[in-house]
Amino acid sequence: MKHRVLVVDDDSQYRELLKCWLESEGHEAILAETLEDGFVGIATEPLPDVVLLDIHLGQKNGLTLVHWVRKQRHLAHVQIAAVTGLNTFKDLKSIGEAGCDTCFTKPIDFKALREYLASLSVPSVS
């Protein structure tokens, strides 16, 4: 299944890496550099199916976007995967409690990401 994926990451090289990989897998990639860009990307039609979200976006916390998305009924279908260098139990617990559906630590395991995307049932891209 192919998906529309919003990538929110302030590291331009990592954003481009994810974009290239997603497109090579047949997915559509939408890129956002800042938290503000992420808010625009998540609310713009056509809506994404999945958000790959860096947690530390400069001085801002990506979990702010997660909290907002989870309060929006029309975005209930959107899956959010944190992509982060954070890997302590406390960090992972706060990521899960915020409403992320899963978490990938950097550097990302592309096999695990492929399996995750394949497991999702609501594709937008045909």
Regions found by a protein language model. Name each.
Residues 31-50:
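Acidic, metal-coordinating helix/loop segments flanking the phosphotransfer/catalytic sites
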Residues 108-117:
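C-terminal output helix
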Residues 16-24:
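Charged docking surfaces used in two-component/phosphorelay signaling
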Residues 63-76:
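Short amphipathic alpha-helix used as the core "switch/output" element in two-component signaling
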